[in-house]
Amino acid sequence: MSIQTDDFSEQRIIAATPASANEEAIERALRPKQLDEYVGQEKIRGQLEIFITAARQRHEALDHTLLFGPPGLGKTTLAHIIAREMGVNLRQTSGPVLERAGDLAALLTNLEANDVLFIDEIHRLSPVVEEILYPALEDYQIDIMIGEGPAARSVRLDLQPFTLVGATTRAGMLTNPLRDRFGIVARLEFYTPLELTKIVTRSSALLNAPIDEDGAFEIAKRSRGTPRIANRLLRRVRDYAEVKGNGKITKAMADAALVMLDVDPVGFDLMDRKLLEAVLFKFNGGPVGLDNLAAAIGEERDTIEDVLEPYLIQQGFLQRTPRGRIATPVAYAHFGVTAPQTGPNGDLWAGQ
């Protein structure tokens, strides 16, 4: 089952990126508005509650905050919650949009005291824009050039105190000077099935879709630890329940809908299984080089590296080695195949 777009990563129903502008609008309606409504990320939530309360009591801007982690885990949601809990406005933009220094200057000069500026994909800021940002973060001042040629001169503008909330899926791509200017740094982790069950239950109530606990858990455990995927699957299961049943989402109804969508009990879709089956059955468990694997399943090597592999490796189904990709005993068990006692790399699995 796929959502038809031009980008492979967005076609998959279990993709962690938004599939369309319409989906983003639905996501906004389902987002929690306050910290006490936010499910999961207990450590981060507890820290933010303290930092926000302290900043409010001192009537100061919250320290600049960096949120990083895989897509779909709630970085944008947390940025909106921070602004709402602080009782200030939120201005939202993204790194690729800020092409010129003037673009950033226009945003910064329009901020009111203690406002939140949220920059998504902050790792994609251009060096020119990033240089303008440094004095703004440290001293609440920016230097802009007025005029051209010999008549050009630098003017320093004072800014209102503000909070920058940066979000990125690739914290390693941030420059050290930018990373060092964040007082609060938080990594968002994947959610547990129980946390996702709570999210699915809450979202179903907002969507007026009756669901029982087993039905919510069935959706949650196939959502790859990601709320965005859980909410997307919930909407598709709701459609199925309304057409094929009485509208209530039960475990059996959720299972039938997800089977129809080609999402298996661990959250794999057709492409995940195709890749693993190629390693297991076409290359005897590996090792297999990336180019050979790409040719075997008819996908680009970049798609395999950036879209398909990360979740399989993270869940322990696939391993990267210097000689190529190999299937793990977990992958063999998932497909009901006996794993060799001695793997492709000698005694890797001996005794397991």
Curated annotation (Swiss-Prot):
CC terms in the record's Gene Ontology section: cytoplasm; Holliday junction resolvase complex
Gene3D superfamilies: 1.10.8.60, P-loop containing nucleotide triphosphate hydrolases, Winged helix-like DNA-binding domain superfamily/Winged helix DNA-binding domain
The organism's place on the tree of life at top rank: Bacteria
Stretches the record annotates as Head domain (RuvB-H): 265-352
GO terms, biological process: DNA recombination; DNA repair
The protein's Enzyme Commission number: 3.6.4.-
Entry's localization field: Cytoplasm
Catalytic reaction list: ATP + H2O = ADP + phosphate + H(+)
Chain residue ranges for the region called Large ATPase domain (RuvB-L): 5-191
Listed HAMAP family: DNA_HJ_migration_RuvB
Family statement: Belongs to the RuvB family.
Protein name: Holliday junction branch migration complex subunit RuvB
Source organism of this protein record: Janthinobacterium sp. (strain Marseille) (Minibacterium massiliensis)
